[in-house]
């Protein structure tokens, strides 16, 4: 089982599908950074309106998952594809090529399915979360970071983990990444079940 899992993990993280998914996510993240974050970072007062209850642009309201705009909307719509493309269809292709029969003669079916399930889950989660992590790191590098004010972020006081967001935003972001990783991984494994 361990050797099979090692082989499947190596196949999964070297697959062209994972590279394509990561590339698509990183392109969306880079577009967001260069179209929204960088212009604001170069001239932070240009977007600031006096007389309103607004804060200066910061990480909390500028990075892709918390800001407004088409970038995150497109990214969220593509997450099911980004999660499934990397490695989920390999069971079907292995079955068509006859590799599955080779594995079944050497080990139990549950061992092979488990060794296939774990890489599918991990690649799906990685493809969904890595571009957001890169966007947060890039945004944090050029924008000021301070605790969010309730009306400047899409999460209100009744939202999930809002008490953490308004006291420790980076812990909130870490929890958000973990939740998204798990959801994307489960989404990717659903396609494994179908195949």
What are these regions (language model features)?
Residues 90-122:
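Helix-loop-helix units of permease transmembrane domains in multi-pass membrane transporters
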Residues 11, 102-103, 114, 192-195:
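Conserved catalytic-core segments centered on acid/base and nucleophilic motifs
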Residues 1-25:
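Aromatic- and glycine-rich beta-strand/loop motifs that create alpha-glucan
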Residues 1-9, 110, 114, 167-174:
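Alpha-helical membrane-protein architecture signal
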Residues 25-85, 118-188, 192:
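Secretory targeting signals
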